[in-house]
Structure formats: structure tokens, C-alpha cells
Amino acid sequence: LDSTVMCLKPGLVLLNSKRASKDNLPEIFNKWDKIWFDDVAPTSEEELNFQKDIRDPVAKELSRMGFSSNLGSMSSPWVGMNFLSLDPETVIVDERQENLIKVLEKRKFTVIPVRMRHIYTQGGGIHCATLDTIRESKLEDYFS
């Protein structure tokens, strides 16, 4: 879900246009402004090589020994859309997602770029890697 539909603030949603469409979007978003986006940065050569040269051989050896692991798997490039909203104007985004950063900045978001070194091999992005947060703000209903 985090790499497909991201509610940015009341009335504005970021949508992965390769996964979401007008046909499958929940009606609750009909009146919202939509940012359709599909230009994520590809998985880097460094990460692909790390997977091929390190993780895959270890996964094979573990399997041979009778153990199961997720070392043979990588996240899709769409994990780059998995970012964290701090408040309705501020988001933390993987620094490699330059196109996404530009789109968000064009919509007047303050973007805090951070390096997620092993984002594709860990199975999640910034939002997935974040512990529970407590916001000091008033509770808002995004869908009324």
C-alpha cells in the first residue's frame, strides 16, 4: 500500500500510476487532488551486485543446509515511493528518488532527503523502517 497510495495531507493523494487507476481507486478519493507518479529511480547497480554476489550465494547455502530465509529476495524499485510524512507539509524521502522529490517540492512540500543504503535488500522503505511516531498535532479526519 505504501508504494501505491500515499495520503499526503487532507485532499491530496500520491498514486503509483502503474498500480492505481481511475478504475480501481476507492471512491473515497474521487474528490481529492491526485498526483499520478511512476518515475521511481531504478535499483542501483551496487545493490543488484550486492544481491547477486553476496545475498544470493548465502541464501543458496542456507537453503542447502535446510534453513529458509528472505536473502534471495529483493524489494521492487517501487519501494522508493515508501516515504514518511512528518506533517502535512514535510516528508522524508530516499535521496535517490530525485524525480519524486521534484514532484513533491513542486507541490510545496518540504522534502528531507535521506540515504537508505540497503532499501531494496531489506524489504521496505523509510515508512516501513520507522518505529511508531507520536505527532504533536490535532487529530484530523482526512475523509469527511
Regions found by a protein language model. Give the residues of each.
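Histidine/cysteine-enriched polar flanking segments
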Residues: L1-S144
